[in-house]
Amino acid sequence: MSDASHRFCIAPMMDWTDTHCRVLHRMLTRHARLYTEMVTAEAVIRGDRQRLLAFDAVEHPVALQLGGAEPERLAEAARIGASFGYDEINLNVGCPSDRVQSGRFGACLMREPELVADCLAAMRAAVAVPVTVKCRIGVDDQDPEHSLRALVARCVAAGVTTFAVHARKAWLQGLSPRENRDVPPLDYDLVLAVKRENPALTILLNGGIATLDDAALHLTRFDGVMLGRAAYQNSQILADIDRRFFQGEARSVEDAVSDYVGYVEEQLARGAPLNAMTKHLLGMFNARPGARLFRRHLSENATRPGAGVAVLREALAHVMPHAMQAA
């Protein structure tokens, strides 16, 4: 394997895995590898780099996911990303959204494995950190038995050895991005076959992994797993990752959230809005007593002008009253 932290990864998720989300996840697990939201190469090159790329040092190991289809632009974006200190640069070959397709990148690149390889070769030549791929098994009417193998072969020829594979096809027309996460059937066996045909590669399985028990089962056959929606829909499960998969200690959810309160205070002092940070807590206490009141309090109050850390403390009193009394 290329890195021990690839054993358990938290997937890049648009509109979700920003730096605040990643800091929270790091407070729950010290060892899992974190990924940014996808950032387009053009945004990196022409946009506000500090806003798009800056991250907290506690996030390491953390990967930057790029979107694009022009080798030279991706190479420049990768170079800029590496200068910010990211541990890995990942190319998005899996997002099926119309907006991404219109830029000729994301999942539609499954149809152009030679171009993907050219992009990766340029990126690898530009940076010293590992360059990796996140992909689907195919798109639309492609035969996944061929499309996945063709992509992997081209990427390997370009020097890439780590693949995060969402074990579903993507339908570029007729399904929304949300539907593309559920409707196309999973084909774990195909991804496993590719792993067995390429034992030296690091293959991370993504798609349909909802619990740590699911992850443990897949880790008997794959090098790593990549957890998506469950990481924010039921964030508390992340607290047991280190114990189960890295021979570390489980983290108390209460301790992690208490640490996050301190982070929120620091960010508020720097001008960040409260709701930008509290939205990442909404899935933390699922099925716990007081969870509904916690979510309601945040939803009703965190977006109010001038909302401060007191709003968060009041909400947390519904789910972890003893910790809030001690604070």
Report each predicted region and the residues it spans.
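A cross-family glycoside hydrolase active-site/sugar-binding cleft signature
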Residues: 11-13, 37, 65-67, 92-94, ...
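Active-site-proximal loop/turn and secondary-structure-junction residues that shape catalytic pockets
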Residues: 40, 68, 95-97, 137-141, ...
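Active-site beta->alpha loop and helix N-cap motifs at the rims of alpha/beta catalytic domains
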Residues: 61-132, 137-144
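Active-site-adjacent beta->alpha loops and helix N-cap segments on the catalytic face
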Residues: 43-52, 97-127, 172-192, 213, ...
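Glycine-rich, positively charged N-terminal anion/phosphate-binding segment
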Residues: 2, 13-87
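Alpha/beta catalytic cores of nucleotide-metabolism and tRNA/nucleoside-modifying enzymes
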Residues: 1-4, 8-14, 20, 118-121, ...
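Non-cysteine beta-strand/loop elements that form the S-adenosyl-L-methionine
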Residues: 36, 87-97, 157-170, 227-230
